[in-house]
Amino acid sequence: NSIMFFMIIFGICALSFNWADFKKIYTVKEVNIYGTTFFDQSIIEEKSNAIMSYNIFNSKLRNYKDEILNFDHIIDCKISRKFPSTIDITIYEREPVALISSDELIILDSEGVCLPVEYCDLSLPILTNFKSNPELYPKGSTTASTNVLNSVILMKYTKDNFSMIYEDISEFVFNEDSEYEIILKNGKTRIILGREKLQNKIKYLSLFQETLKEEKNIKDFKYIDLRYNDQIIVKEA
């Protein structure tokens, strides 16, 4: 009797799914994309069009996730079903923090991973006068340049803790004296950091900005020299 009971239940379920398929209840009609903050969402939308009209139970959704993960700028993605006919896609992106020019322009994320620029149109600081050998910047992998990686870490630190300064940076320069400089977006302010304790120098720059209050701004200076202990040397524009 118990076998007969389970056979009846199985038959009812099978008939239900066949009926639902016949009525197209479980056909994907909507795809929602979340989490695209830094990069162009249209490349995900193009791929999502391919799963419209799929049955929501279709095992090919796993293949679709693998296709998304082929993009270097995506760390992970989660695809979830919202019955009866909606797919939600959550994207986890890499965070772009700087640009560098090798044989082509390259985005560097917060971990120093090299990414293509075609999916991102953000205004980012450019790392200038660093080694440009293409082998130092393998796409989808961490830069092989320790100097560049340390500079990326500094840019990330500045972005997280002193966002107003970060947003004003046009170039981060490794100069001919092997010292680090910042060129602001106004094109006229040069900030000399020196060679060491660079995070502290960014802190000092922020404190200097605070002491100016509303009277002036760091952009009002031609250069700001932070290389020396207990003093800041400035020249007005």
Question: What residue spans do the PLM features occupy?
Answer:
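Short polar catalytic/cofactor-binding loops
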Residues: 35-38
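Charged, solvent-exposed interaction patches on well-folded alpha/beta domains
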Residues: 1-32, 42-55, 62-66, 70, ...
